[in-house]
Amino acid sequence: MALYYDHQIEAPDAAGSPSFISWHPVHPFLAVAYISTTSTGSVDIYLEQGECVPDTHVERPFRVASLCWHPTRLVLAVGWETGEVTVFNKQDKEQHTMPLTHTADITVLRWSPSGNCLLSGDRLGVLLLWRLDQRGRVQGTPLLKHEYGKHLTHCIFRLPPPGEDLVQLAKAAVSGDEKALDMFNWKKSSSGSLLKMGSHEGLLFFVSLMDGTVHYVDEKGKTTQVVSADSTIQMLFYMEKREALVVVTENLRLSLYTVPPEGKAEEVMKVKLSGKTGRRADIALIEGSLLVMAVGEAALRFWDIERGENYILSPDEKFGFEKGENMNCVCYCKVKGLLAAGTDRGRVAMWRKVPDFLGSPGAEGKDRWALQTPTELQGNITQIQWGSRKNLLAVNSVISVAILSERAMSSHFHQQVAAMQVSPSLLNVCFLSTGVAHSLRTDMHISGVFATKDAVAVWNGRQVAIFELSGAAIRSAGTFLCETPVLAMHEENVYTVESNRVQVRTWQGTVKQLLLFSETEGNPCFLDICGNFLVVGTDLAHFKSFDLSRREAKAHCSCRSLAELVPGVGGIASLRCSSSGSTISILPSKADNSPDSKICFYDVEMDTVTVFDFKTGQIDRRETLSFNEQETNKSHLFVDEGLKNYVPVNHFWDQSEPRLFVCEAVQETPRSQPQSANGQPQDGRAGPAADVLILSFFISEEHGFLLHESFPRPATSHSLLGMEVPYYYFTRKPEEADREDEVEPGCHHIPQMVSRRPLRDFVGLEDCDKATRDAMLHFSFFVTIGDMDEAFKSIKLIKSEAVWENMARMCVKTQRLDVAKVCLGNMGHARGARALREAEQEPELEARVAVLATQLGMLEDAEQLYRKCKRHDLLNKFYQAAGRWQEALQVAEHHDRVHLRSTYHRYAGHLEASADCSRALSYYEKSDTHRFEVPRMLSEDLPSLELYVNKMKDKTLWRWWAQYLESQGEMDAALHYYELARDHFSLVRIHCFQGNVQKAAQIANETGNLAASYHLARQYESQEEVGQAVHFYTRAQAFKNAIRLCKENGLDDQLMNLALLSSPEDMIEAARYYEEKGVQMDRAVMLYHKAGHFSKALELAFATQQFVALQLIAEDLDETSDPALLARCSDFFIEHSQYERAVELLLAARKYQEALQLCLGQNMSITEEMAEKMTVAKDSSDLPEESRRELLEQIADCCMRQGSYHLATKKYTQAGNKLKAMRALLKSGDTEKITFFASVSRQKEIYIMAANYLQSLDWRKEPEIMKNIIGFYTKGRALDLLAGFYDACAQVEIDEYQNYDKAHGALTEAYKCLAKAKAKSPLDQETRLAQLQSRMALVKRFIQARRTYTEDPKESIKQCELLLEEPDLDSTIRIGDVYGFLVEHYVRKEEYQTAYRFLEEMRRRLPLANMSYYVSPQAVDAVHRGLGLPLPRTVPEQVRHNSMEDARELDEEVVEEADDDP
């Protein structure tokens, strides 16, 4: 809660009357313009408490016309009535006069948004733009000049678009971008001079003239008329969000214009505002689009531009306003959300904007503003203005100027005395023990208060005043000067602070004792007294406690540093001590002085500190060790997540119970409550309840920190004041102080500014004696720690039913139903005990507790519990039982739609019982029970019922009314309503009753109504008209009756059709009828077949040789049919050469061998479907496992013969024969499946078969195939085959790529594999190894020869010539490569004769080879030219490629292996 202190400015004696006031936007400096009786004008600057700033007086012999502060610097522009413009630099105490260009009153004076330019305009219409330096001096000539010829009234700047980057514009301008150049240089215009200024300065503005026109000046300095109003413009605003211009004229016409960047305005809205005209209105645009007007009336008028809504705010007389008090001026502080208005009676009215999370859901209009306590000044307030970053309020009342600053309202509670500040110099003192309240007015602005049972102390930082109760009045007991920021009292002592000490004084100020603190400990700045103990906190986060029980204060604990006990904290925000002095609670602040979510508890005796974090609900117990280290023990206190994420702001100890502690916590980030569709909070709590909590705890050395109670702070209370069993005490909001009839539930009102609420355990026991109070405290403590035995011991001697009822109520809070049963028993509350026993079936604990709360009359708790556990069905019933029907309907409509109709129905019954038939009728309709409930309800009022029936046009109601008329014998009228209801059965029934059978038949035929047709058929049967009876029985689908008539009357043709339309039982009866007659046996067979009686149908078909019917029957047979029937039918199809159908029937009969033999015998292809049907499940009892495998292999063999390799593979696999499956898969040639099958089979033979197959493919171009070949040979342990593959790879590298290095590597791998292989013939293995080693040596020699060529060409050539002499060289190395190497060498040496010799030798050894394949054509040409020989012709190459031959050999090997495998 806050108060506004008013400070009158210290104006010079000769200053005169204040005419203008202007706050600096940032700094707390207020400029005030005066006009004296001699028309002399002056300006002075003042500080926030009204002190005049020295050397800031500016005076001229003419009056001030306008004032304007620089946006950031301490530079003030002053416009005078002569046209002079003075710029005063407060920092340098300099005055700079602008060049005298204006010759009339300065009516417009504005700084540009950046502060680099000053815009001035006068009464003659001259508009100038000046550039100024940082000290306020003019730089050159005016940058812009326009002469409009008429009185300038307003000017507003338009901020540039946010997307324009100055750096990017500069780069673009340097690059020659014309648009960028234009933005950096304003060109010459017809009406203005050159302006060298960029649009980033914000130099886009609007100016208005006295004739009602508005002109727009763009970034080029061009002026354009954009608005022409019908009267003088009173106020001009620019809405940045919508890029729109708001114009309000003298006759209160509002116009809204959208203004695009090019400046062409378009009017989008025009309205006439309500209000008194003929005088100047003060208008403000707040919240972006809300217009507030003070027009000299007793109310503020609002117009929401976005929504098009309007409303008014009027001051309330109960706040001290007078009737007929008018509002002159208005101003809004966005930071504080405060709207201030000045009245003609010297009062400042304030409305605070209600935050969304505190306001009522969906609050709009005036409900969003809460009237605050006004500030009373003197005179007629003509101007009011918020300013500076401190959000100070300046008020001009013509005779004086006052500065209002906000300060927190002081309050204190101690020893059953509460003192509450209600105005800057007025206290409300309540003696709670007697209920007597006093008003105490002081001659100072109070900054602090301390109350005891004997006296009240107030101070303002410079003076201390002590007041004591004397009889029925409060009188002064002492006053003394003392600059103490804090103060405390105990008995006859006053404790004040100064640098590094606490002074113990008498009431008259005499110092009796000094409590000293060292410089390292800091200056005392916090004091608190509880019981006989004083605790002191310093600005360096040290604290110390003193025992005051003796004549002099003695140290109770040594001075401790909070930073050492709890590393990471910043400072101390506040501290308190328990009544026994054993525990000190401290609210720390963070390093940046922001509120911390932690609270610290220091145990004086154990020298330990416990830190509780409200944000996480975690308790951290730290034990201080002798060597300055700490041990920590962490645990969690809060189970309810809703209690986390709070920050403590107030904390108190009970003044007599040292274990009881209470604190007030606010939500860390206030948020809007989730709301249901009907606008109500989902958890049922009000806004303040969700964001401010009161939490009480039991704190003991043995059991630690225990949560006792938590509840939302009462909505009528402002803050927690303290606690003393059995009450919590709160300060009341000023607007709630006089509302005696609106006390918060559970709170008891004390006159004036204090309210109290009993502790949860003391509801109903507020006036109990001390013994009962102590017993209750013990009980509450033991219940909190869960020791129920000790809890009951503490109250076993208490016989009061009120105590047990209170215990039961406490069980609702603690949700201890076991204890509640005992309490209900002691209370003799049988109904409650029964309800609690019946509620045990509910799964949610909260729902069961809610039943207990309901029985105890704690309806609000029950409601909250139902909401908490989201049992909206029970909440709905609760509301219904409580008669809160509107809430029940809301819950049903938004959360319990399952019971919506039943809720509507019960509410309608309630309304009916209340004789509200019209509304009851409406809710019966909503519940969809009106068709029988409304006729019942209106049965005594037949005319109304008939009107209702005709109005509703409902078939059910028409039928009900027709039945009523029929019961009254009004047949014609009944027929009319039956016809409206389209009740064809009733129509036919009445027509038959009246003997009009033809009409009844016509209705039945036209409508096809089954009941009508049946009724008419019965009528015809009774009249022995069999044909008509059968016809209408058929239309009624009563086929049994129709069949009966046909059988009785020999209507065999109709019988067949009716039987086919009827049920299987009727078909069988009809078939027996035909069978017994012995004629038309085909019909009997068909009916048996259609009825599903296949055995009888087959028997009859065979007996009567009906083969066509037999085929139709066989088509419907499946595996569920009788195997004997299936076999008999299959034989029939075999006899008639229908083998496929026979196979299907054999398979359905599970005769798999016969079916397979039939396929083989008739050379039938086995399809996949047939193969699947022949496959017996593994766990089937039809065949043994061995027979099942044999059958599968036979199926697979058959598939192999018919070429279905994939199917064969599948069946071999199912039979467990993977080798045969692999052979089948190899025949299919499906490489992907072969690779996959080999990978998953994990059999050596299969790996080898797969690798052999893959070698037959083009593995040279597919690296993946080569990888699989190597992998399969390796997994199959076929190292000899793998060696052969590596050998083939080496040959490919030589033949196709001439890559002898890779060839050597492949031969090496081949050698390794062959060396590891287990050969059948060691001799053959040794021979192969020797061959491989020989080939490897040759290849290595050739590689070495080519590598050494660059270092030693002679040795390299020599090695090549030796290679040519090796026998069988061609089987390893291509001879042509060696010859080519030699030829190339000799060509480079220009030894053409030797080169030619090697060419000729190569031709002899390779007669069919193409020389260009080994020797480049250039080298051959060079040889022939060098020797003068003719050039040779190229011969096509015919070279054997070993790799291709190897591939053919591998292919043959795979085929041989596949054929040889068993």
From Swiss-Prot:
TPR repeats lie at residues 772-807, 869-904, 906-934, 955-988, 1010-1043, 1078-1111, 1123-1156, 1189-1222, 1376-1409. The modification Phosphoserine is found at residues 360, 1443. Changing residue 790 to K: In RP80; uncertain significance. Changing residue 663 to W: In RP80; uncertain significance. Changing residue 440 to P: In RP80; uncertain significance; also found in a patient with Leber congenital amaurosis and renal failure; uncertain significance; decreased localization to the basal body. Changing residue 777 to R: No effect on localization to the basal body. WD repeats lie at residues 4-48, 51-90, 93-132, 139-188, 221-259, 266-305, 322-361. Residues 1448-1462 have a biased composition (Acidic residues). One of its GO terms (biological process) is cilium assembly. The keyword NADP does not apply. PROSITE patterns: WD_REPEATS_2, WD_REPEATS_REGION. It is found in: Cytoplasm, Cytoskeleton, Cilium basal body; Cytoplasm, Cytoskeleton, Microtubule organizing center, Centrosome; Cell projection, Cilium. Component of the IFT complex A (IFT-A). IFT-A complex is divided into a core subcomplex composed of IFT122:IFT140:WDR19 which is associated with TULP3 and a peripheral subcomplex composed of IFT43:WDR35:TTC21B. Interacts (via C-terminal region) with IFT122 (via C-terminal region). Interacts with TTC25. Interacts with TTC21A. It is linked to Short-rib thoracic dysplasia 9 with or without polydactyly: A form of short-rib thoracic dysplasia, a group of autosomal recessive ciliopathies that are characterized by a constricted thoracic cage, short ribs, shortened tubular bones, and a 'trident' appearance of the acetabular roof. Polydactyly is variably present. Non-skeletal involvement can include cleft lip/palate as well as anomalies of major organs such as the brain, eye, heart, kidneys, liver, pancreas, intestines, and genitalia. This is Intraflagellar transport protein 140 homolog. It comes from Homo sapiens.
